[in-house]
Each structure stands twice: as C-alpha cells, then as structure tokens.
Amino acid sequence: MNVSFEDVVEAGARCLQQEGVEPSTAEAVVRHMATADLWGRHSHGLTTRFAAAVASARSGAGRRRPSVIDDAGARLVLDDTNGFGYGAGVMATDHLIERAGDHSLASVALRN
C-alpha cells in the first residue's frame, strides 16, 4: 500500500485537530515529523513522537497559542506558552521574513 506524504500529513493533522489543536499547528507538527522520517531522522519522526504529541494535545498543550510579548518594529519576541513549538517556529519565521522586508534587518526571539 502506498500513501502519499500529503495524505499522511492530512491524516495526522486530523488526529491532532480532534484533540483540540488548531489546524495550522496540527499541520506544522505532523509535516515536521513526517519530514524527519523522510530524511531518515526517525528519532524526530512520526513513529517516535506522534503518540507523545497526541498525549500533549489531550493534556491541553496543543491548545496553547503563541503570543507577541514585545514588538519593536524590526525586533519581535514571541512566547509559545509551552505549546508544541512547531507552529510557533513557522510563525516566527513568517514574522522574520516580513519584518526583514520592511526594515532590511530583523530579529525574532521565540521562548517557552
């Protein structure tokens, strides 16, 4: 049986969403884990970490959302409130690219 990468991501994200994880965070978590498996980094892949991600979601960690705690134009600090980190990393990268375009130079810090 062959299953496409996108089908794996979609199915895994649906599982996390059923536990209350926001769609964009669920997709980021599963996409990163599935990519780790594709690259042979199974210690960070679905087979090793997905069950723990579901357990974290059930405990409420997956329902937390990153928040901006300091915004100074080219500098931004985000707090992930002990969430998954995957979605916050994507958010931080998106902010960094946008702010670098606006200010020619930018920094984004991500904590917790």
Annotate each predicted stretch with a short phrase.
Residues 1-19:
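Generic N-terminal amphipathic, Lys/Arg-enriched alpha-helix
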Residues 44-100:
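Active-site cofactor/substrate anionic-group-binding motifs, chiefly glycine-
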Residues 105-112:
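Glycine-rich anion/phosphate-binding loop at the beta-strand->alpha-helix junction
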Residues 20-28, 43-45:
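Flexible, glycine/charged-enriched surface loops at secondary-structure junctions
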Residues 18-20, 35-42:
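N-terminal and secondary-structure boundary signal
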